[in-house]
Amino acid sequence: MVNNNKGYFLGKNAVVTGAASGIGLALCEELLAQGAGKVVLADINGKNLRAHKERLARQYPGQVKGIRCDVTQENAVKQMIEQGVLFMGGRFDLLINNAGLGLSGTFTQTEATNSPSAKFNLRVQTNEDWEKAFAINFYSALYGCRAAIGVMTPQGGGQVVNIISGIAWSPMAYQSMYAATKAALNMLTLTLRYEYWDEGIKFNSATPGTTLTAIWGKNTPPKGAQTPQESARKILKGVTENQRLILGDKGDEEGAPHCFDPSIAEGLDSYYLNVARVRRSCELIL
């Protein structure tokens, strides 16, 4: 795949969260391949982080730093950004908030009685589960945005990319937590885009599309799922174009324009109701 936007990242410094595996790691690899100056990998998995940092550092000496960070803790995120900025020589051009967790479950105990939960070991979503979901999928990015703005504003600008999901506008049954967190993150991103436009800070929402990562667990990904590397290249192409909403695959491209179209509301109801009934019959859970 030929990328004609390599010059955009030339010499730029970046921080990527959730960077020890999957799409986050692929984003780091692609940034370095496209000429980024220094790249900070942040992740809570110290073992994987260390291994990939050392591997990339051999290929790009002096350009890579790994920082173990629990992104659900605001002070930890702030300190990680501070350490990263020091490593990057004071210039912070790009933050990609990629850390996230895929979550499925039944909304209530009553629902669980007649649901796929027994077959697929789905949990009833407790308040603690909801708090965890928002901590990882939403607040971690919020903390990153705050820390980045504090550095990027005085330096005259920068760019923040928040990784969301097509489920932010696709109401799939048994994924209420995941959908809610990603929808919230999308609107946070888009409102900040205009709030900080005049400060020179660009904000982009990005869906990775259906991608072959550990988020699938024991489930079989749909036919045609792309690799993390393919997803990363599409996301970064959208970053170079400052796209408001970067769509990671054809499914997201086709779904996003129609999700709130009143002229096809009846069709959407039929589609999503069918998905819910299929899942309730234990035929499919993603």
Regions found by a protein language model. Give the residues of each.
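Canonical Rossmann dinucleotide-binding motif of NAD(H)/NADP(H)-dependent dehydrogenases/reductases
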Residues: 2-40
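Residue(s) in the substrate-gating loop at a strand-loop-helix junction
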Residues: 165
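Conserved glycine-rich Rossmann-like NAD(P)H-binding loop of the short-chain dehydrogenase/reductase
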Residues: 36-52
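Substrate-binding pocket helix/loop in short-chain dehydrogenase/reductase
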Residues: 106-131
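The beta1-alpha1 cofactor-binding region of Rossmann-like NAD(H)/NADP(H)-dependent oxidoreductases
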Residues: 46-47, 68-80, 127
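SDR active-site lid
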Residues: 187, 193-254
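Active-site helix of classical SDR
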Residues: 145, 181
